[in-house]
């Protein structure tokens, strides 16, 4: 199990409050969204994995925002395609 120091992660993000928000978002993605870890899991909990990803510079607020925007666009496109196919069958 790798040791994570919060100070190292804070230096990547800027302040501890943003660190908490970003780490919580990422941990939630891994727990409920089925997102894969970007670092070896090593039997760590999602919160520790999220902090390790932030510490290594793999996850930032901008990265999370971009991923969520992309997923939202893909979902909207799928919904539009479904509605379009229903409209064409009528």
From Swiss-Prot:
Organism of this sequence: Vibrio atlanticus (strain LGP32) (Vibrio splendidus (strain Mel32))
Record InterPro entries: DNA-dir_RNA_pol_omega, Pol_omega/Rpo6/RPB6, RPB6/omega-like_sf
SUPFAM superfamilies attached to this UniProt entry: RPB6/omega subunit-like (SSF63562)
Gene assigned in the entry: rpoZ
Subunit structure: The RNAP catalytic core consists of 2 alpha, 1 beta, 1 beta' and 1 omega subunit. When a sigma factor is associated with the core the holoenzyme is formed, which can initiate transcription.
Enzyme class: transferase
SMART domains for this protein: RNA_pol_Rpb6
Catalysis performed (reactions): RNA(n) + a ribonucleoside 5'-triphosphate = RNA(n+1) + diphosphate
BP terms from Gene Ontology: DNA-templated transcription
Role summary: Promotes RNA polymerase assembly. Latches the N- and C-terminal regions of the beta' subunit thereby facilitating its interaction with the beta and alpha subunits.
Pfam families membership: RNA_pol_Rpb6
Region annotation Disordered: where it falls in the sequence: 69-90
Protein name as it appears in the record: DNA-directed RNA polymerase subunit omega
Enzyme Commission no: 2.7.7.6
Taxonomy, superkingdom: Bacteria
């Amino acid at each position: 199990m790798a040791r994570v120091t919060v100070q190292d992660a804070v230096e990547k993000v800027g302040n501890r409050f943003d660190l908490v928000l970003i780490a919580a978002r990422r941990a939630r993605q891994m727990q409920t969204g089925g997102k894969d870890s970007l670092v070896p899991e090593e039997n760590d909990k999602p919160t520790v994995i999220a902090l390790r990803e932030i510490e290594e510079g793999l996850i930032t607020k901008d990265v999370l925002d971009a991923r969520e925007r992309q997923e939202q666009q893909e979902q909207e496109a799928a919904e539009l395609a479904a509605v379009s196919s229903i409209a064409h069958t009528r």
